[in-house]
Design a protein with these regions (language model features):
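S-adenosyl-L-methionine
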Residues: 1-35, 45
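Conserved proline-anchored active-site loop of SAM-dependent methyltransferases
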Residues: 37-50, 61-65, 126-131, 181-198
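A short acidic (Asp/Glu
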Residues: 46-52, 70-73, 179, 196-202, ...
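Conserved S-adenosyl-L-methionine
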Residues: 52-58
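Class I S-adenosyl-L-methionine-dependent methyltransferase module
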Residues: 58-162
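Hydrophobic beta-strand segments of well-ordered beta-sheets in folded domains
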Residues: 58-60, 185-187, 219-226
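Active-site segment flanking the S-adenosylmethionine/decSAM binding pocket
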Residues: 164, 168-210
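Long, positively charged, glycine-interspersed low-complexity recognition regions
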Residues: 207-249
Length: 249
């Protein structure tokens, strides 16, 4: 029997593990052979859960952030973390790493990038940085304090994580255009939250971008994810109460 992941195999800011139980309930409300389109694929967790719960469905995962590349490099990431763990032996757990040990760790990461051409900096960040900090390069990491938070166990290879799922990599508006006329299509809408951290997303988000997303919802079935830290629902409520207010600028 296929394993269903309750959280993404690799770290990702904004993955929907806390919503999984409620999301599973919602999936049962749609008819057989429904087409689900995950417009903001992120870690792919929503697409994965959808395909596991609804194997009859067509599931489209928009992997705009190229999470697949991170998954494909899990074996190399595990080796790198194992080497970093060895370098940090004797360093107190969760304490700051400085001096020669810090330099050796950066040298090992640099060698990985030179020899293999790729380092999963988001996953490495989860083992070396605190407070949900993530970097995208060694240059950025060298500016940060690093800590001995290195994961003790290897990451699962997750080879079946995206099994049976159609994968695309486009701007969400292009994906929407491709599927908007499919009968009964359901859009899974999980944009980076307004007023929250969007650092691991490749696109830059402005207020206008969030409002553009709302045009996708009109006239279609959708599951929309938000947060009590986001202001988007408050904004929509204000717009509903003030429909005739034009721009004062």
């Amino acid at each position: 029997m296929r394993k269903m992941y309750s959280s993404a195999p690799l770290p990702f800011v904004g993955q929907k593990r806390m919503f999984a139980k409620e999301f599973i309930k919602v999936l049962g409300q749609f008819p057989d052979s429904t087409v689900f389109v995950d417009l903001f694929g992120g870690s792919g967790l929503l697409s994965h859960i959808t395909k596991c719960v609804r194997p009859d469905a067509t599931v489209v995962y928009n992997d705009f952030d190229n999470y697949r590349c991170r998954l494909a490099n899990i074996p190399a990431t595990n080796v790198l973390l194992s080497d970093l763990r060895r370098i940090a032996e004797g360093e107190p757990k969760n304490k700051r790493i400085t001096g020669e040990v810090r330099d050796k760790m950066f040298a090992r990461i640099e060698r990985e990038e030179k020899e293999h051409g790729y380092v999963d900096y988001i996953t490495i960040s989860a083992s070396l940085l605190f407070a949900m900090k993530y970097v995208a390069s060694l240059e950025e990491m060298k500016k940060e304090a690093i800590y001995n938070r290195i994961r003790r166990a290897d990451y699962s290879k997750a080879e079946d994580y995206l099994e049976g799922i159609m994968v695309t990599c486009k701007d969400y508006k292009e994906v929407f255009k491709c599927y908007k006329d499919v009968p009964g299509v359901v859009f899974l809408v999980d944009p980076p939250y307004l007023s929250t951290e969007v650092g691991t997303y490749k696109m830059y988000w402005r207020l206008a971008d969030y409002l553009d997303v709302l045009t996708v919802l009109k006239g279609h079935s959708f599951v929309y994810f938000t947060s009590n830290k986001s202001s988007i629902l408050e904004l929509c409520d204000w717009m509903d109460r003030n429909p005739f207010v034009g721009s004062p600028f």
